[in-house]
């Protein structure tokens, strides 16, 4: 019985749980601000895989995106995603329309 309890408390299991919890916090914050789920998905991806992932405060998130990807906080979620989609920043290429990025990079 004590062996089973030890297996449940493996370091890898305890490392994964806070990350999932943190992701769901980010999801909830973005859901409350961006009603359009199609665009929300990309924002979650960005917040999860970028250096921002330490902080789930929404205004910090907007400031981060504003500084990293050069768009206004006044933009709608759709406009934000469109501007992110066409930003030539390699940090986000693995997470969004990859073929479009490749084409853009070759042209420019």
UniProtKB/Swiss-Prot annotation:
Report the source organism.
Dictyostelium discoideum
- Compositionally biased intervals (Polar residues): 1-12
Name it.
Putative uncharacterized protein DDB_G0286769
Reading the lineage from the top rank, the first entry is Eukaryota
Q: Where is this region: Disordered?
A: 1-22
């Amino acid at each position: 019985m004590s062996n089973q309890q030890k297996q449940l408390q493996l370091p890898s299991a305890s490392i994964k749980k806070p990350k999932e919890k943190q992701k769901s916090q980010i999801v909830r914050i973005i859901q409350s601000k961006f009603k359009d789920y199609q665009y929300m998905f990309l924002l979650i991806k960005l917040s999860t895989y970028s250096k921002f992932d330490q902080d789930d405060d929404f205004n910090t998130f907007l400031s981060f995106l504003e500084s990293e990807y050069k768009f206004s906080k006044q933009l709608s979620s759709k406009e934000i995603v469109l501007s992110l989609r066409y930003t030539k920043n390699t940090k986000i290429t693995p997470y969004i329309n990859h073929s479009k990025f490749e084409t853009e990079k070759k042209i420019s």
